[in-house]
């Protein structure tokens, strides 16, 4: 008998659907009263502690989710990814970001070739180059040390490295290594982003890293040309070779741009942009800022989770458990969003990065075979560090829509503060909220409790909390390069698990193409209208009206302008 074309046609899926009604009638207050259940929903790996007992799930639910994983051939799909099979079928590519952090003596193959030696050739090149820049043996055109770096990229070439950079900034070892240096990221084509990035920097001491696999990404290359002009106007065109390097595979275009191809750092088609932070995309700028040794620990942390993900049983496998629970929340309980709530300011850029990893990967409406999905998949990811989020959007989470939450806590702060006479130290104050919020969401507060507190009758409806709002808690022992790598890999693999179960391709992103192609048409129109005075044609009434309004209001923009750079 042939396997069902869609996971929703399997008996395991139907069994979970039938099971759903009983769970909906069971409040988390009741589920949390079962100590044995709670204990079974706690998993530890390498001092990372996961507690998923506050999920709207019984032990029976979890067992049924394991059966769903089996029906989806989850283990086989994970193995196929690690074996280099072309699981990105629409682009006919392997998906091997795990190879980017594999030890030097590993063997991971794509199309019959072990790619790990190539990975380490690039890593060795990054180490050598970053060491030379940091110790002053590679200097700028005027003989000054290059102490400031601007990394130019967009999407996965920016969000992942920015997350890791922000997380490392306050780590004692990393911050010591970065003393006197600055790393900035230029992503948006908005000239304001250029202005902010070059503000306060001296071209003589600035190195620009241009990140574009093809060296044709429109936004990135316009920003790169802008920074090239910033350097050339101050130091002369020949300075570009000393002040700009590339992360790209298109060496002819790199050379044409004015960058010596020797100073181009490769990555490969089997690395998707949103999974590329462990490639030269992230490793080069991060090594320039913090030194290769710190970044290598980050890679080792990610690799430890890669091993855990590929070898641990589902019952003990943190990414698998998180992925299955997300499928349960989205496709069965019908919750469309997820809040990522790290109780560490160092993780303030985690949610924006995972937003891309998750939503670009799993924001699909058809199966890997092109069949429309008859169920909800993908989730809307957002988040903010605690306790900031508590004073922002937690109101909705507590008394509005049900939004499953990821609470992430760190046992030891990167920067502890103790004040004499305070009841608790600053980190304990933060963590008090980390421990309290999941229970507040799970248990809520009943009208009966409010009456016992003598709350006015007319206020009781406003102060009632329904509870029964699911969350998971992840407790990390510390937050250094190694643990940051682990956290990244947990979320990467969680997203893959969801896609594998839903039967979609989590590794393409055709959704970004349509808007880009329409922007090309608009770009041509703006050029024709500004340079030749041609009327706006070929657009619907609404777009035509907006374009005409924009062109009229910017009629003072010269048709053939002289170069003008931001002045800030």
Curated annotation (Swiss-Prot):
One of its GO terms (molecular function) is carbohydrate derivative binding. The active site is at 360 (proton donor), 391, 516. It is an enzyme of class 5 (isomerase). The keyword Cell membrane does not apply. It catalyses: alpha-D-glucose 6-phosphate = beta-D-fructose 6-phosphate. Signal peptide: none annotated. CDD domains: SIS_PGI_1, SIS_PGI_2. PROSITE patterns: P_GLUCOSE_ISOMERASE_1 (PS00765), P_GLUCOSE_ISOMERASE_2 (PS00174), P_GLUCOSE_ISOMERASE_3 (PS51463). GO terms for cellular component: cytosol. Its EC number is 5.3.1.9. Pathway: Carbohydrate degradation; glycolysis; D-glyceraldehyde 3-phosphate and glycerone phosphate from D-glucose: step 2/4. HAMAP family: G6P_isomerase (MF_00473). PANTHER family: GLUCOSE-6-PHOSPHATE ISOMERASE. Homodimer. This is Glucose-6-phosphate isomerase, cytosolic 1. The gene is PGIC1.
């Amino acid at each position: 008998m042939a396997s069902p074309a869609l996971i929703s046609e399997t008996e395991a899926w139907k069994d979970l659907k039938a099971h759903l009604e009983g769970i909906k009638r069971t409040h988390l207050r009741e589920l949390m009263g079962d100590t044995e259940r709670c204990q079974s929903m706690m998993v530890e790996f390498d001092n990372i502690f996961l507690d998923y007992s506050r999920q709207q799930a019984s032990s029976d639910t979890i067992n049924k989710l394991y059966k769903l994983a089996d029906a989806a051939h989850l283990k086989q799909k994970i193995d196929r990814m690690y074996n280099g099979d072309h699981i990105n079928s629409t682009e006919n590519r392997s998906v091997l970001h795990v190879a980017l952090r594999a030890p030097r003596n590993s063997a991971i193959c794509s199309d019959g070739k072990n790619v790990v030696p190539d990975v380490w050739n690039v890593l060795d090149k990054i180490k050598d180059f970053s060491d030379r820049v940091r110790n002053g043996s590679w200097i700028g055109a005027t003989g000054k040390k290059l102490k400031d770096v601007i990394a130019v990229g967009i999407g996965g070439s920016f969000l992942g490295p920015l997350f890791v950079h922000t997380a490392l900034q306050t780590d004692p070892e990393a911050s010591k290594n970065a003393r006197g240096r600055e790393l900035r990221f230029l992503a948006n084509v908005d000239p304001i982003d250029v202005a902010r990035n070059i503000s306060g920097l001296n071209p003589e001491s600035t190195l620009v890293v241009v990140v574009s696999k093809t060296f044709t990404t429109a936004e990135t290359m316009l920003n790169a040309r802008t920074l090239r002009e910033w350097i050339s106007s101050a130091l002369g065109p020949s300075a570009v070779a000393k002040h700009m390097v590339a992360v790209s595979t298109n060496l002819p275009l790199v050379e044409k741009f004015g960058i010596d191809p020797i100073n181009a750092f490769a990555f490969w088609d089997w690395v998707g942009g949103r999974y590329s932070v462990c490639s030269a995309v992230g490793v080069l700028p991060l090594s320039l800022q913090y030194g290769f040794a710190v970044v290598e620990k980050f890679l080792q942390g990610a690799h430890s989770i890669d091993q855990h993900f590929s070898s641990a049983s589902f019952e003990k496998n943190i990414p698998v458990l998180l992925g299955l629970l997300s499928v349960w929340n989205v496709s069965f309980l019908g919750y469309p969003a997820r809040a990522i709530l790290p109780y560490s300011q160092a993780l303030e850029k985690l949610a924006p990065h995972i937003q891309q990893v998750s939503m670009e990967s799993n924001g699909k409406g058809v199966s890997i075979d092109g069949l429309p999905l008859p169920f909800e998949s993908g989730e809307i990811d957002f988040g903010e560090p605690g306790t900031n989020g508590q004073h922002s959007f937690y109101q909705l989470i507590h008394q509005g829509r049900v939004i499953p939450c990821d609470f992430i806590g760190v046992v030891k702060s990167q920067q502890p503060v103790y004040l004499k006479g305070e009841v608790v130290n600053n980190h304990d104050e933060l963590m008090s909220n980390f421990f309290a919020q999941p229970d507040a969401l799970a248990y809520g507060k009943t009208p009966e409790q409010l009456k016992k507190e003598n709350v006015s009758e007319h206020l009781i409806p406003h102060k009632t909390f329904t509870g029964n709002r699911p969350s998971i808690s992840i407790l990390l022992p510390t937050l250094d390069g190694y643990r940051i790598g682990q956290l990244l890999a947990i979320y990467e693999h969680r997203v893959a698990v969801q896609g594998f179960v839903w039967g979609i391709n989590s590794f393409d992103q055709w959704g970004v193409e349509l808007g880009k192609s329409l922007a090309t048409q608009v770009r041509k129109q703006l050029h024709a209208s500004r340079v030749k005075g041609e009327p706006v044609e070929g657009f619907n009434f609404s777009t035509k009206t907006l374009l005409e309004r924009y062109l009229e209001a910017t009629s003072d923009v010269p048709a053939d302008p002289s170069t003008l750079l931001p002045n800030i």
